[in-house]
């Protein structure tokens, strides 16, 4: 086992005096691999000043600077997860997306019972980000991985709590076709890119379904119902259900017209696989699975 030397008060004072300069600040945290510095630095307030997003040009997105201190926390988590947890819980949230992604990485490196204590801090982030910045910082990708991590560690309630917000779909409007009576079209969008959404559904949700069972399936049903409602009302007024045209078969088939990046189609496949898993592992009988889906009014279900 590796051993570390705790810093003396004089060493801490010397570092505090030196890291007022940006380059030395970065150099110290990039080179420091000693977890025994965590609490002395925290006691001096070093982790209380994360950088805020900076709006350089009002025509573009804010800049979210990398924070060397939070990268240090990520590296130290495996050595002292409790100390890192205490520090992160005391840190102010400035809205800096690089820092938020670092906190997700911290949680991914923690035992599930420790990481679960950060979930209440993370869930509100999903309601704030926009598509452009979110995709760049991959916050949803990290949270998807955290859903799977928590589920594997037995923290299914925390995993479900993230998944409920992570998988939410909504409508976005685009201009209607020229000359059409429909002024705009509505389509289904996720809180992240459709590619990332598909990755979460195929990589992380199956783990959640395996460990959490029916509650995970109900999340998928709810979001698929929302997606179908958006599709059926895409022209501004209710339309017939055409799912038998764009998704005629439940299994992958060339007859299916929807694209792989279509959120509604992704949800159909994810729900199909989730229900199949519960039937295979004996959680649901085939009859119970059929009744679960048939009680919903949407033809696609």
Model regions: which residues?
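Non-catalytic all-alpha helical scaffold/repeat segments
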Residues: 1-301
